[in-house]
Amino acid sequence: MIDKKQKQKIVSEFGKNESDTGSVGVQIALITGRIKYLTEHLKINKKDHSSKRGLLKLVGQRRSLLRYYQKKDLEAYRMLISKLGLRK
C-alpha cells in the first residue's frame, strides 16, 4: 500500500493546498498510485484473485473520475493526464 509520506507528497503535488484531499485531481492521483502498487503486487502473486478484483474496481473508479474531470475542466484534465503519464 501507499504509505502516509507518499500520500502527503501526492496531495501536496496535485492539490491546491496541503489538506486538499477531496479534489478530483488528488483522488485520481491517489488511485493511480494504488493501481501501480497493485500491478506490481500482481506480477509477483499471479493467483491473488481478490487483489485482481480490487485492481479492476480501482481502474473503473479512476475511469469514471477521469470522465467527470474531462467534462468539468478540460485544461486541468489534460495537465493531470500528462503529469501522471496515463495516456500516450
Swiss-Prot record:
The gene is rpsO. One of the primary rRNA binding proteins, it binds directly to 16S rRNA where it helps nucleate assembly of the platform of the 30S subunit by binding and bridging several RNA helices of the 16S rRNA. It comes from Borreliella burgdorferi (strain ATCC 35210 / DSM 4680 / CIP 102532 / B31) (Borrelia burgdorferi). Gene3D superfamilies: 6.10.250.3130, S15/NS1, RNA-binding (1.10.287.10). GO terms for molecular function: rRNA binding; structural constituent of ribosome. The keyword Transit peptide does not apply. PROSITE patterns: RIBOSOMAL_S15 (PS00362). GO terms for cellular component: cytosolic small ribosomal subunit. This is Small ribosomal subunit protein uS15. It holds the Pfam family Ribosomal_S15.
